[in-house]
């Protein structure tokens, strides 16, 4: 799905942009296949295995799976990054997978990601030129630990919960405050990148 200039203006105004249904169904299913076979099993298999991971637990890019590699370097995501940064000279700093299961604690304090993959001291925000993203590969409900994003200039209490259909993506600045939330549902999983 092409990300429009209007959507990118929203990103620059609020510090993040949630794009629902960014991935096609085939791209979403291919990414889930990669996660469930190379990183972490789906909830049912995880519980049947006494909450043990029976995969290779390959969490970092590059993956030996075309579906995961494709979504990491998705042409429309790369295009949006180039337009945000104003250059085709972009670098992927990190790609990693995450899995949250029912019954585990996941809540974090609100924080920024500046400092991850950065050697220097904290600097003033620079017009959102340090871009990060979250993919949600399965549907995320309020019960399945949605990521909480805080719009620029707002207090943490005014967060936006990333309750989205599977295949959605959130672009955000490393200066955008955000936090994990608890998985309050009694079953299920939330795979993310």
Task: Describe these PLM feature segments.
Residues 1-14, 20-124:
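Non-heme Fe(II)-dependent double-stranded beta-helix
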Residues 15-16, 167:
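Catalytic palm active-site di-aspartate
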Residues 18-19, 133-135, 170-172:
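Short hydrophobic-aromatic micro-motifs
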Residues 77, 102-105, 140-142, 169, ...:
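Short, charged/polar surface micro-motifs in flexible loops or helix N-caps
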Residues 94-97, 133-135, 193:
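A structural signal for short, well-ordered beta-strand segments
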Residues 104-164:
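Catalytic core of non-heme Fe(II) oxygenases with the double-stranded beta-helix
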Residues 145, 155-193:
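Catalytic core of Fe(II)/2-oxoglutarate
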């Amino acid at each position: 799905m092409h990300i429009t200039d209007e959507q990118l203006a929203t990103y620059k105004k609020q510090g993040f942009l949630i794009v629902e249904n960014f991935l096609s169904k085939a791209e979403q299913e291919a990414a889930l296949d990669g996660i469930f076979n190379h990183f972490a099993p789906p909830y049912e298999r995880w519980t049947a295995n006494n909450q043990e991971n029976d995969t290779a637990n390959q969490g970092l890019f590059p993956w030996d799976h075309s579906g995961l590699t494709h979504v990491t370097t998705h042409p429309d995501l790369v295009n949006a990054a180039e337009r945000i940064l104003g250059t085709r000279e972009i670098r992927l700093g990190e790609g990693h997978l995450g899995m949250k299961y029912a019954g585990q604690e996941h809540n974090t304090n609100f924080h920024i990601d500046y400092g991850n993959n950065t050697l220097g001291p904290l600097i003033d925000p620079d017009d959102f030129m340090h871009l990060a993203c979250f993919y949600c590969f399965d549907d995320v409900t309020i019960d399945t630990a949605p990521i909480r994003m805080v719009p620029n200039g707002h207090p943490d209490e005014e967060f936006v919960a990333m309750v989205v259909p599977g295949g959605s993506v959130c672009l955000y600045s490393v200066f955008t405050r955000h936090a994990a939330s608890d998985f309050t549902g009694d079953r299920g999983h939330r795979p993310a990148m």
